[in-house]
C-alpha cells in the first residue's frame, strides 16, 4: 500500500470511529429504537454516510457492539482478577456487568438486540452472533478457567455446562432488572448483583427452607420419581 492509499485508509478508519462514537451518543439520548435518519441527524451528517460505512442499521449495531462489548469484557475481566475467592469473583463480574449496562440501558439494548426487521426473521430472539457471541464466549471461558483449577479433573460436565447456564441466568435477570421501572421493590445495582450471585451459588434453597409452614413440605410433595398416588 502506497502513502496515499495508507493515508486514505487511515482517514476512513478515523471517520468510522467518529461515526461509532456519535451513534453511541445518539442512541444513549434517543433510545435503542432510534432510526438511522435520527442517528445521522444527531451526528450532524446524512444517513447515506452511515450506510456507506456500515451498510445498514444491523451493521451499525455490530460496529457499536464491538466497541461497547469490548469495554464491558475488559471491565468484567479486571473485576474478576481482583477477587480473592470464586464467589467474590462471581459477584465482581455480575456487578461489573450490571454497572456497565446501567450506564446506558439504551446503548446496551441497541447492541444486544436485533433491529425490528431482523427480529421478525428470527422470531424476536436476542442476538447471539458476531460481537455479542464472542463476548459471551469470552465471559464463559473467564468463568470456566478458575472452575477448572478449583474443581480439578473429572468435572468436565460441570465445567462445560455451568458457565453458559450462569450467563443465561445473569443476562435474563439483569435485563429484566434493567427494563423494570423504578419502584420501592426494585433492588439497587449492588443488591441485585448480590441476589444474582446468591442464586448462582445457592439457588433458591434458602427461600425454600424458610417457606411458610402451611405450604407443602418438600419431603411429602410428589416427585418425578414418585408420582402422587391416586385415591381409591
Where in the sequence are the language-model features?
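Amphipathic alpha-helical packing segments from all-alpha helical-bundle domains
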Residues: 119-151, 157-175, 191-202
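Short hydrophobic/aromatic patch on the recognition helix
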Residues: 43-54
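Amphipathic alpha-helical linker/stalk segments
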Residues: 64-90, 112, 121-122
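N-terminal intrinsically disordered/low-complexity leader segments
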Residues: 1-14, 147-148, 153-154, 208-232
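Basic, helix-initiating cap at the start of DNA-binding domains
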Residues: 1-42, 59-62
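Hydrophobic alpha-helical connector segments
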Residues: 78-106, 166, 190-193
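Alpha-helical DNA-contacting segments of helix-turn-helix folds
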Residues: 58-71, 111, 132-135, 139
Amino acid at each position: 500500500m502506497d502513502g496515499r492509499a495508507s493515508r486514505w485508509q487511515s482517514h476512513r478508519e478515523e471517520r468510522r470511529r467518529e461515526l461509532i462514537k456519535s451513534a453511541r451518543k445518539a442512541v444513549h439520548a434517543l433510545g435503542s429504537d432510534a432510526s438511522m435518519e435520527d442517528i445521522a441527524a444527531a451526528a450532524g451528517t446524512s444517513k447515506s454516510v452511515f450506510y456507506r460505512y456500515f451498510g445498514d442499521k444491523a451493521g451499525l449495531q455490530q460496529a457499536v457492539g464491538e466497541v461497547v462489548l469490548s469495554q464491558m469484557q475488559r471491565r468484567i475481566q479486571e473485576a474478576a482478577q481482583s477477587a480473592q475467592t470464586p464467589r467474590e469473583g462471581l459477584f465482581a463480574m455480575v456487578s461489573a456487568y450490571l454497572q456497565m449496562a446501567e450506564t446506558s440501558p439504551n446503548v446496551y439494548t441497541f447492541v444486544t438486540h436485533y433491529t425490528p426487521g431482523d427480529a421478525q426473521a428470527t422470531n424476536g430472539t436476542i442476538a447471539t452472533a458476531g460481537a455479542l457471541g464472542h463476548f459471551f464466549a469470552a465471559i464463559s471461558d473467564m468463568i470456566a478457567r478458575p472452575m477448572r483449577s478449583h474443581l480439578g479433573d473429572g468435572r468436565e460436565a460441570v465445567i462445560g455446562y455451568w458457565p453458559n447456564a450462569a450467563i443465561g441466568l445473569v443476562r435474563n435477570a439483569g435485563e429484566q432488572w434493567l427494563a423494570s421501572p423504578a419502584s420501592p421493590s426494585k433492588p439497587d445495582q449492588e443488591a441485585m448483583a448480590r441476589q444474582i450471585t446468591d442464586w448462582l451459588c445457592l439457588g433458591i434453597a434458602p427461600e425454600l427452607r424458610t417457606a411458610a409452614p402451611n405450604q407443602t413440605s418438600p419431603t411429602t410433595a410428589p416427585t418425578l420419581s414418585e408420582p402422587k398416588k391416586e385415591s381409591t
